[in-house]
Amino acid sequence: MGIEVGKRRLVYTTSRNNDRNLDFLKRRRIEDSSSSSDHEDNQRGSLSSSSSSEEDSDRDDSHVSLRQSVDDRDLEITKKREEILDTSEIKPIERQKKSYDDEQGDVDQICKWFMDRYKFPKILYASELLEKATPLLPIVRDMYRGLVDSHYKFEANEMRQSSQRAILSVQEFRNMDLTKFTAGYYGMKRQFQIGEVILQKYKSFLLRRQGDTMKWWGVSDFAHYVLAPEVLVSLCIKEMQLSDDVYDKNARERAYDIFVNTVKFGTLVADQSPLEPWEVTP
């Protein structure tokens, strides 16, 4: 029931209705309060998430901005100006150094192994070598007098007989196993020093006594690869005290065996050792 005033309708309610309305309002306030609290929590969570996202975004933006602020061309120019090597340029150098270190380590191990096994005398400088070997050079003549059976001369003759040519060709020389003509632990460098001295002292003597084998080899190569090792066999007998007599057949056989088994030391250790004292690095 009610009275209409203009367009507004006035409603008169009873006390019972008022009580119901009051209860309804209380419930609404409680619900509103709870809803408001949840809304504030959600809002705070949203704000926190938004803030975190903004911070992440800021960090990402700053990160991207930092990365994009350096031009690749500027880096290349700086590298060239400062002569800086990049990683791709450094790695090969590191590998090369490592490879060299490994190789040097192998040489040291080889040297120690042979020294422990054979008790070699010290590696001689050229002047020391010539001083010790010069008194032994007459064995070159004695080889042609039948006083010495030459192991290396026999090998040289075998090589000549297996060839189809009148003289040693370049290709045959390249294919030759020169370890058969290497004076073991003395190495090829010191062997050639002896070969040069032999040519200086005995070249005319050798030219007068050229047989088929020496002609096939040539006098120079014959002196370096056949005669020089025989002189060093005599020196080995002296230095390693295999016998008091360098013409002792058994002692020479022992020296030949030592040479055959120590070529690796000669090529990797002795040939890397300086011939002159001034070549030694401090």
Swiss-Prot record:
Ranges for region Disordered: 22-70
Main location: cytoplasm
Any single GO CC term annotated in Swiss-Prot or TrEMBL for this entry: cytoplasm
Location of this chain's protein in the cell: Cytoplasm; Nucleus
Pfam families registered for this protein in UniProt: RTC4
PANTHER family named among the record's database cross-references: RESTRICTION OF TELOMERE CAPPING PROTEIN 4
Function according to Swiss-Prot or TrEMBL: May be involved in a process influencing telomere capping.
Family indicated by similarity: Belongs to the RTC4 family.
Name this polypeptide is given: Restriction of telomere capping protein 4
Species annotation: Zygosaccharomyces rouxii (strain ATCC 2623 / CBS 732 / NBRC 1130 / NCYC 568 / NRRL Y-229)
